Structure formats: structure tokens, C-alpha cells
Amino acid sequence: MTGELSPIDKAKFVAAKRAADLVEDGMRVGLGTGSTAAWLVRCLGDMVRKEGLKMRGVPTSTRTAQLAREVGIEVITLDEARWLDITIDGADEFDGDLNLIKGGGGALLQEKIVATASDQMVVIADLGKEVSRLGAFPLPVEVIPFGWQTTQALLEETLISMDVLGRTATLRMNGDTPFVTDEGNHILDLHLQRIGNARQLALVLNQIPGVVENGLFIDICDTVVVGHGDGRVEIRDINQGTVEHDRLDFVESDNLFTDLAD
């Protein structure tokens, strides 16, 4: 039941439900990856089944694609869509300029490609994801498997000259083996603690041989929908400079997501 969800899960639910209202008939929608984005996919699936919403989704990972199909969303590829009306995704951190750290779910490469191929990117989050300065959450960097330890050493050497507090890179694991992305790559998590110049860091990291992409999303996000455990929602639009307040009531039948609770 909805009442059994934690305040954080309630916050994710109301943010996802409010963001789903931004999707209109005929839209091509980028579908993010991760626990928060999964709530959004379920909300959209509910609208497809119960309200007849006509939309097509471009998933950013195989597991998002599987979930989208399960809830009745028509799934197409980005090349089939060519361009997207909106992408809705979660974030590991966002700052006051709506710059993001993403990739905690391991899909940062496809997430960034899909987000930049969209007219607008909307992030759904709980208030705990907001930070004054990025960097407390480890920054994911996707690297090719060949020579990943050399790439790791190059990353740590590069960080010496960057405005960050920490400079350790660790290989993300999946049990006893390295985590493998949908594209067959590894992820190195950079433990930076604080990032002084995120824009500069994003550019520098991608110049290192072996690096495919990093999890800094700079000037990509247009709107963040922040959910609260009591049903309050804030919609912050960085382009319009506006903050809209809303409130969603919890109804027990609304909770389609007990299996997604963290």
C-alpha cells in the first residue's frame, strides 16, 4: 500500500507522477534508467492503459526497455525516433544550475545521448539529491575494457591538476566481476568529494584515451521535478527561471510500485 512506502519512495512517486503529466499524445519520450525513472515508466504505462495515452518510448537501457514493454509502452530505438520531444530521467545529484551527476545505474552513455537528442530534459528527484556543489556522489566514467587500469591511472593523474578534493578512481563491480554496461564497457567511479569546475572537468575527462563518456550533465537539464514525502512537488524551470508548486494526494490504488521500493 502507498502508506507503507518510505518518505523517499513517496517523494519519488509524486515526482514521477507529476512529470508524467508533461507527456502528451503523440510524443516520443526518452525513458531514463534507475529506481526513480522506473516509477516514471510505471506511471506512463498506467496512463497508456487507463487513459489511452499514445506515446512511444526510447529507453536508455535494456532493463528500462524490458519494464516499458511490460507496462504496455511502445518501445522504439533512438534512430527510429530520430529526435525526441522530451526525456524524463532521474539524477544522482543536481545543483542550483540544474547541472547533474548521473550514471549510478550504469547507463550514463545512453542517457546522455538520449537527453541531448531531446527538445527538453526533465529530471525527477527527491530533495536529497539537491546539492550546493556537485561531487559528493561518485562521478561515473565509462571506459573501454582494454587497458582500463592504464585509463584509471591516467584519470587519477589528470585529477591532480583539477579543482577537486578527492582523486581516487575505483572499478565498479557486480559481485566478483567488473560491472559491464549495455555497450560492453566498464565504469570507473571517481571519488571527488567536491567538484570546483564541473564544466571544465567534463571536457577534460573526455579527452583521456579509453574514456567513452562521463556522468557530468552540463547545460542539458531544463527542468527538475522535486518530490516530497508529504505529496508536495516543486517544478523548477531553469530556462524560465520559475518555480511552480503543486501537491498530489496519495491514493492506495495509485501505488503500482511496491516492488520498486528501495
From Swiss-Prot:
Substrate binds at T33, G34, S35, T36, D89, G90, A91, D92, K102, G103, G104, G105, K129. It comes from the Bacteria. GO terms for molecular function: ribose-5-phosphate isomerase activity. InterPro entries: NagB/RpiA_transferase-like, Ribose5P_isomerase_typA_subgr, Ribose5P_isomerase_type_A. The active site is at E111 (proton acceptor). The keyword Transmembrane helix does not apply. Coiled coil: none annotated. It catalyses: aldehydo-D-ribose 5-phosphate = D-ribulose 5-phosphate. One of its GO terms (cellular component) is cytosol. Pfam families: Rib_5-P_isom_A. The keyword Isomerase applies. Its EC number is 5.3.1.6. Keywords: Isomerase. One of its GO terms (biological process) is D-ribose metabolic process. Pathway: Carbohydrate degradation; pentose phosphate pathway; D-ribose 5-phosphate from D-ribulose 5-phosphate (non-oxidative stage): step 1/1. SUPFAM superfamilies: D-ribose-5-phosphate isomerase (RpiA), lid domain, NagB/RpiA/CoA transferase-like. PANTHER family: RIBOSE-5-PHOSPHATE ISOMERASE. Belongs to the ribose 5-phosphate isomerase family. Catalyzes the reversible conversion of ribose-5-phosphate to ribulose 5-phosphate. Homodimer. NCBIfam families: PRK00702.1, rpiA. This is Ribose-5-phosphate isomerase A. It comes from Ruegeria pomeroyi (strain ATCC 700808 / DSM 15171 / DSS-3) (Silicibacter pomeroyi). The gene is rpiA.
